[in-house]
Amino acid sequence: MRDSTVVIRHHHGGKKNKGNRERKKEEKRRRKYLQAVSKIKKKARSNVKDWGLYGYCRMTEFGVEGGNLLEIDGSGMSFAEFSHGIEKRHVPCVIHNLLRHWPAMKRWASVERLMEQLKGVTCKVGSDDDGYAVRMLFEHFVAYMDDPEHGKKDDSPLYIFDSTLLDKTTLKHDYLVPYLFSEDLLKYAGEERRPPHQWMCIGGPRSGTSIHVDPLGTSAWNALVCGHKRWALFPPGSVPEEVLKPKGVNSAARWFDVVWPQTLEDSWKYEKPLYVEQGPGDVIFVPSGWWHVVINVDFTVAVTENFCSSANFHRVFMHTRISRPKMTQKWLDRLKTVRPDLARIGQQIMDNDERCSDISSPSSSSSSSDDDDDDDDSSVSS
């Protein structure tokens, strides 16, 4: 009897010790997570002292439901119809029924499914003051989104916007570029030289991207797998930049609080925005040069790409010849073989530049320095 009693006591003691060990492990994980979040928030936005200053966590609406953006059925539209009827006319739209066969529609549809592929992976959630990526473990990001003292409270929560996730994980096998956007002309510049052009986007309510124009004259498509996003869009040149981007308005949440209500007033003297609520399976097309701002209504997962096609080639080439001259020359050389029609357009632009340069600076040297190299692979945001 004594022996059995001793055994029973040892058994209970073992359970207690195991419970203590698990509790200590959890406390250690919690401390590690909190330290990581504190460090990451300071690096990503060193100028923000109070992340909950405006109390946006108590706001239930940003923008309005519904929309006035053109809607089209992607399943019944050919590439030529889209190119000539939509893209070349620079018409933004929301496209339905393009993603039904994407494995991502199931594999990315919840945090739990994503955790199967992204646990232990660091994801970009911002940039520091020197432009370097600020990264966070995916499991820490998930905990952050659900944390009442951080993600659930922050006015503009951290947001995964990462151009490397698709290539360094199996996620890239879960989707295909929709056929309407299959003309990817920048691939002829060489993958090692072209700027980042595809991003995985994951975030909770109030996160998003503030008002901007996509880089290098590119157009964009954004495919939403789960959740809801609200968009506002303005045509190029329709509203002064200082009106769209007033000082101190640096987040999507702040924009929808400060600028969006102004656009609804009768006193708004500029062109009214186009707007839409994007739902699961919807694809938004943003033409070259259009201003747009996007806020997440709830937990969202999306993939977005910037692209150059025949429809916006002239605009993109005009941009790249200035900002990435060496890449542009290699691109032009390759286009002479694969797309001689576009190469002629590009060469005309280059020739016109040279003539203008000769007229404006007849005595200047024609030599160039390697200091003007455009090898910088810094990230381009969308």
Language-model segments: what does each one mean?
Residues M1-V283, I295-S382:
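N-terminal accessory scaffold of Fe(II)-dependent oxygenases
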